[in-house]
C-alpha cells in the first residue's frame, strides 16, 4: 500500500462502505468512496457469505474507480458485537541505555496480546493509556527517549469472538485483497469526539440498520462498549405495521417524511401509501408518521440508558454524540435533548463526499490506522500543507432539569417539547464519490512505503491469522 493511501471497509447491515483516504497534516483527505447495499449482513455479522462477498467486491471496485487507486490492501472495521473491553499492562526490559523507537513500542504492546485469558476471543486492539519509562517516568509517547532499565505500558484491550474475526476477514480476503489490520468500532469512535468530550465522559450512540452500538469514553480513553439489537430496521417495521403498508414503502416514507420528534413534526406535509391488504391508498401526515418513529427511537435511547446503568456509568458530563444511518432522521437530536440534561450533538464526518452519519465508522477506521502508524513510526512524512478542516458541532444549551432516575443526572423528566426543527440530511441511493483533487498528480508526487515498513504491516496481521487456525 502506498504510504499516503489508507483504505477502510465498513461491513454494515444495510450496506458495505469503502473509503480511500490519504493523510495530510491536520487530518484525512478522502480520495474516493464506494457503497453497495446488501442483504448478506444481519446484526452486523455475515449472514450469507456469497451475497456479502459480492457486495464487498462491488464496493471495493467502486472505490477503486472513484479514487484511481488499485486497491490491494485494506483496514477492516469490526462491530462491537461479541467484544470484551478490559485493561492490561506489560513491560519489557533493557540491559543497556536504549533509545526507544517504534519497534520497542510494538513489542511491548504485542506482549499484551499473549496475556488474553478470555476464552474463544482474540485481542484485536491494544491502545496505550500511558507508558512508564524506567518505572517512574510516565509519558504519552516514549519515542526517542532513553531508557536504562524498562518500558512499561498500561493499555486498554479489545478482544472479539474468534469466529466473528475469522469470518469477517475470510469474506474480505475472498475478494482478492489483504486485510492489513482490524479496528473495533469501540476504539474508532474516539476519533469522532473532541478532546473535551473524551475527557469529561461522553457516550457515542451509533444507530445502524440492525444494531445500535454504544461506547463510553472518559479521561481521554475508552471505558466500555456494548451493543443493542434494536435500530433502524425496527423503526421501519413499526412504520409498516402502523401504516398497513409494505416494508419497502415504509422505508421510503421514513427517509422522505420521517421525523423523530412528534411536537416538531408537520401536519401539513401529506403523503399517500398503498395498503397491503387492498388496492386502496391512504393519506398520512408527517405528524402521523412521527408518532411511530418517536416511540421506537425513544425506546432505543431507553435501552442505551439501561446499558449505561448496567456498566455503572452515572455521569455523562461530556454529552451524547449520535451517529450512524438513523441519525439522518429529523428530530433525533431534539428527542434525545428532551430526555437528557447533558448536551447532544449529531456527528457527521466533515470530509467532502462523506458528509453523512453512516460514514462515521469507515472514516474513523482510517483515523485509527493513521494513529497507530504514527505511534509505531510507520508514517514519517506529511505530504500536504497545513489545511484547517473545521467540523460542524451542534451544541445544546445546558438544562437544569431534575434527574428521572436517582444517580443518573444526565437523565431528566419529560418536559414540554419545543417546536424546533433540524435541517434534513439528504439520503441517496448507491453513490461513488470522488474528490476534486487531481489524482494523477498525487500518484506522481507520492512515494511507496519502504519495503521494511511494508513487511511490518503485512506480517503483523498474517501472524495473527495463522495463530487463529493453529
Curated annotation (Swiss-Prot):
Belongs to the FtsA/MreB family. Residues 436-461 have a biased composition (Basic and acidic residues). SUPFAM superfamilies: Actin-like ATPase domain. The lineage of its organism: Bacteria, Bacillati, Bacillota, Bacilli, Bacillales. The keyword Ribonucleoprotein does not apply. The gene is ftsA. It is found in: Cell membrane. This is Cell division protein FtsA. InterPro entries: ATPase_NBD, Cell_div_FtsA, FtsA/MreB, SHS2_FtsA. Keywords: Cell cycle, Cell division, Cell membrane, Membrane. Residues 425-434 have a biased composition (Acidic residues). It comes from Staphylococcus aureus (strain NCTC 8325 / PS 47).
Amino acid at each position: 500500500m502506498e504510504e499516503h493511501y489508507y483504505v477502510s471497509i465498513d461491513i454494515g447491515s444495510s450496506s458495505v462502505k469503502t473509503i480511500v483516504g490519504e493523510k495530510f497534516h491536520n487530518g484525512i483527505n478522502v480520495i474516493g468512496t464506494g457503497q453497495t447495499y446488501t442483504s448478506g449482513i444481519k446484526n452486523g455479522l455475515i449472514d450469507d457469505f456469497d451475497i456479502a462477498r459480492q457486495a464487498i467486491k462491488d464496493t471495493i471496485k467502486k472505490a477503486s474507480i472513484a479514487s484511481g487507486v488499485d486497491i490491494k490492501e485494506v483496514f477492516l472495521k469490526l462491530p462491537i458485537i461479541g467484544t470484551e473491553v478490559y485493561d492490561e499492562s506489560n513491560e519489557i526490559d533493557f540491559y543497556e541505555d536504549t533509545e526507544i523507537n517504534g519497534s520497542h513500542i510494538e513489542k511491548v504492546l504485542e506482549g499484551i496480546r499473549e496475556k488474553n485469558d478470555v476464552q474463544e476471543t482474540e485481542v484485536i486492539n491494544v491502545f496505550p493509556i500511558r507508558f512508564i519509562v524506567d518505572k517512574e517516568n510516565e509519558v504519552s509517547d516514549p519515542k526517542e527517549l532513553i531508557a536504562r532499565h524498562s518500558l512499561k505500558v498500561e493499555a486498554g484491550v479489545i478482544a472479539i469472538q474468534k469466529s466473528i474475526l475469522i469470518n469477517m476477514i475470510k469474506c474480505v480476503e475472498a475478494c482478492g485483497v489483504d486485510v492489513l489490520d482490524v479496528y473495533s468500532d469501540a476504539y474508532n469512535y474516539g476519533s469522532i469526539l473532541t478532546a473535551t468530550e473524551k475527557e469529561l465522559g461522553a457516550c457515542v450512540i451509533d444507530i445502524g440498520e440492525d444494531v445500535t452500538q454504544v461506547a463510553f469514553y472518559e479521561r481521554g480513553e475508552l471505558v466500555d462498549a456494548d451493543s443493542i439489537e434494536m435500530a433502524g430496521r425496527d423503526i421501519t417495521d413499526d412504520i409498516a405495521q402502523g401504516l398497513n403498508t409494505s416494508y419497502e414503502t415504509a422505508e421510503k416514507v421514513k427517509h422522505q417524511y420521517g421525523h423523530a420528534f412528534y411536537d416538531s413534526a408537520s401536519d401539513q406535509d401529506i403523503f399517500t401509501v398503498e395498503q397491503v391488504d387492498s388496492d386502496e391508498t391512504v393519506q398520512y401526515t408527517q405528524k402521523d408518521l412521527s408518532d411511530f418513529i418517536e416511540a421506537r427511537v425513544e425506546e432505543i435511547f431507553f435501552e442505551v440508558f439501561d446499558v449505561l446503568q448496567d456498566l455503572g456509568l452515572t455521569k455523562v458530563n461530556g454529552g451524547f454524540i449520535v451517529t450512524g444511518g438513523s441519525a439522518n432522521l429529523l428530530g433525533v437530536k431534539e428527542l434525545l435533548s428532551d430526555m437528557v440534561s447533558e448536551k447532544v450533538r449529531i456527528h457527521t464526518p466533515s470530509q467532502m463526499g462523506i458528509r453523512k452519519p453512516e460514514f462515521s465508522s469507515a472514516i474513523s477506521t482510517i483515523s485509527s490506522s493513521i494513529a497507530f502508524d504514527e505511534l509505531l513510526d510507520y508514517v514519517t512524512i506529511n505530504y500536504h500543507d497545513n489545511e484547517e478542516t473545521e467540523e460542524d458541532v451542534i451544541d445544546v444549551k445546558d438544562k437544569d432539569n431534575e434527574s428521572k432516575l436517582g444517580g443518573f443526572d444526565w437523565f431528566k423528566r419529560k418536559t414540554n417539547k419545543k417546536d424546533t426543527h433540524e435541517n434534513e440530511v439528504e439520503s441517496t441511493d448507491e453513490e461513488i464519490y470522488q474528490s476534486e483533487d487531481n489524482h494523477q498528480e498525487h500518484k506522481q508526487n507520492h512515494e511507496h512505503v519502504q519495503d521494511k515498513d511494508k513487511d511490518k504491516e503485512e506480517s503483523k496481521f498474517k501472524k495473527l491469522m495463522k495463530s487463529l487456525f493453529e
